[in-house]
Amino acid sequence: MRHYYSVAAIRDAEASLLASLPDGVLMKRAAYGLASVIIRELAVRTGGVTGRRVCAVVGSGDNGGDALWAATFLRRRGAAADAVLLNPDRVHRKALVAFRKAGGRIVENVSAATDLVIDGVVGISGSGPLRPAAAAVFATVSASGVPVVAVDLPSGIDVVTGVINGPAVHAALTVTFGGLKPVHALADCGDVTLVDIGLDLPDSDILGLQAADVAAYWPVPGVHDDKYTQGVTGVLAGSSTYPGAAVLCTGAAVAATSGMVRYAGSAYTQVLAHWPEVIASATPTAAGRVQSWVVGPGLGIDATATAALWFALETDLPVLVDADGLTMLAAHPDLVINRNAPTVLTPHASEFARLAGTPPGDDRVGACRKLADSFGATVLLKGNVTVIADPGGPVYLNPAGQSWAATAGSGDVLSGMIGALLAAGLPAAEAAAAAAFVHARAAALSAADPGPGDVPTSASRMVSHIRTALAAL
């Protein structure tokens, strides 16, 4: 499990540790870790360290000090080391003295012969885009294709929201210290490496599942399980206009777990043609017993659709509401607010705005938390980084790392997967987070099949790769 910490939590832990250490020890510890990561990166990219050239772009404060000390350690290992000082009057003095003593050079610009650039402009206390001088330096670096290693986070990216509102560093690798921050999931920070500097941090309430966590959560049939005890997923989706939504949603539920899927709606003929193992009927009341309901994908907003939404939400079962279900729910939020059973809402940005009255904005984590608390429901906000908020509980971040899931019908697939996990008994937030993780993996695998390169994919192909994604956990 990944834990993401606020800047305040990191600063509090640093203050406690700094009080117990001699002056400068913590900075050197961080810089040594940074230099060690850079040594490995240089070895991979260039075959070694000796004779290679690094350049630290140095801002004021401790972030610049980390970069200078790291460049000093690299110089001592045989690399040529340069430094561009963006604010010479406010540079970390002790680090600069050590850098010069080791033979480092102060330069005006990054040399064309540079093998790697260290971004030490601003750290986790900074905000806003790069200032003109730094922006000019990194524009040249970007044009030259020299890889950048960022210290703590790529400068110019908002540390809280991950939003970029102007010039920013594009890093191949980010090295951070003590604990991950939400920005490392919310923004493109390249590969992220965490260096342990001895901070004593509690568990956080912003989390990220890893493959081992998902494997532990995902239901596996026990020796004495049958199709009923594994969970029966009910699906209320599709219409004469969008029968494919029903096919995709039920297919994803079939692929996600080994229990049973029941479908109720007008697309039952198409569903059975694709998935003969599904038990299909024309109406919810005829569907039979289930352990969860998925309602909304392709359902429409007519009287029949409204009745289906009412039917599901008036049960005492876990319910996932998506797509057209969210549109109807926006007009009748009391249907969810008064529920005692688990409810999962899975909006994209426009659907979120209808539910909340305003778009999620830059602070997607804060907005998702607020909506979850106001509705008393687990909210999954779709995007390249999926945000899942539990009312009064943790937030899960799932960075996809690619956008292959951004295709028509992809949300229908995700809904079916979450519904299957709810039927199997997983808590709502864990079901949503685990399904989002596997959903992103299935999208990537479907784009890579048959190879050798990635190609456009589709929601139908994603369904067929759910099991492959699960097997790879």
Swiss-Prot record:
Segments of this protein annotated with the region NAD(P)H-hydrate epimerase: 1-203
EC number(s) reported in the record = 4.2.1.136, 5.1.99.6
Annotated region ADP-dependent (S)-NAD(P)H-hydrate dehydratase: the residues are 210-473
Catalysed reaction equations from the record: (6S)-NADHX + ADP = AMP + phosphate + NADH + H(+); (6S)-NADPHX + ADP = AMP + phosphate + NADPH + H(+); (6R)-NADHX = (6S)-NADHX; (6R)-NADPHX = (6S)-NADPHX
UniProt: (6S)-NADPHX 2 binding residues = G298, D412
Which residues of this UniProt protein bind (6S)-NADPHX 1?
Answer: D152
- Name the cofactor(s): K(+)
Question: Which residue numbers delimit the YjeF C-terminal domain?
Answer: 210-473
Chain segments carrying region NADPHX 1: 62-66, 123-129
Does the record bear Isomerase in its keywords?
Answer: yes
Q: What does this protein do?
A: Bifunctional enzyme that catalyzes the epimerization of the S- and R-forms of NAD(P)HX and the dehydration of the S-form of NAD(P)HX at the expense of ADP, which is converted to AMP. This allows the repair of both epimers of NAD(P)HX, a damaged form of NAD(P)H that is a result of enzymatic or heat-dependent hydration.
- Protein name per its UniProtKB record: Bifunctional NAD(P)H-hydrate repair enzyme Nnr
Q: Which organism is it from?
A: Mycobacterium leprae (strain TN)
Give the lineage.
Bacteria, Bacillati, Actinomycetota, Actinomycetes, Mycobacteriales
